[in-house]
């Protein structure tokens, strides 16, 4: 069996430094995950990524500080007040410190993401960030993961100790969520204006999403010069109205991660490529960033994700070792 000739020509150009277009991104995503073309895509992305990032893998961590039934009602999120099984809970300072200490003890954590609810008060968010900033090593970056916010608030996040923020134009925005694309992009613009690093990815990917839909959102991360790009699949939640679609395989996620790598790898602003949730196929397809997790997790139905869907630092290190990475 021979690979598609148009595909092979594009792959050769990518290896020579070509930055792919939206149409080429869509083309690469159109191949079946079991195809020869998908296998080549993953292999070349892995090789390019290891060259550009010097074979370094980065460990990130996320603490889900709060959980509550959320009026945002994202159909893919376990916090949605339409179908959540969670009750309201917020970590106290001691619990936050313990989680932060566990993540940073080995000195191998590049950045710690602090996740709050969409409607957590902004003052509470600033308080969490400032307390953790004072607690953890100065070299460890802090990522803010919260709802939409203004340019003024972005400046306040930075002043409190945040180095970056995670924010995404999500698949199904405005249909599977109660938020508009304009709201999400306005917040991304606020992040960039404040000088915060933009953490971005294509998510939450389901089997129903088309190559055209994915390509549009993938390319938007490049338009905004994201610091980290990546790919995240939607996890099926039994009570979610999206459960009827099921979820993509890790093989398909790896293929999409590889295409994201092609899009982002030549950007001077890109620091790493993430795959969520962590898995070896993704790390062998261009990704070099994975997250350990504790506390609440919007892809989990357990109030403590660590030991359920979430990995700890040691598990992340073992996964990197199995995939032949050097941990930065």
Across the structure, where does each feature detected by a protein language model lie?
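Auxiliary Fe-S-binding modules of radical SAM enzymes
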Residues: 1-33, 222-328
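Alpha-helix N-cap and loop-to-helix initiation/capping positions
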Residues: 2, 91, 124, 178-183, ...
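N-terminal [4Fe-4S]-dependent radical SAM core
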Residues: 24-75, 79-87, 107
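Mobile, glycine- and charge-enriched loop segments
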Residues: 49, 53-62, 69-71, 75-80, ...
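Core AdoMet radical
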Residues: 65, 81-98, 102-129, 133-188, ...
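Conserved C-terminal portion of the radical SAM core fold
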Residues: 111-114, 182-242, 257-271
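Catalytic cores of alpha/beta
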Residues: 150-157, 207-221, 276-285
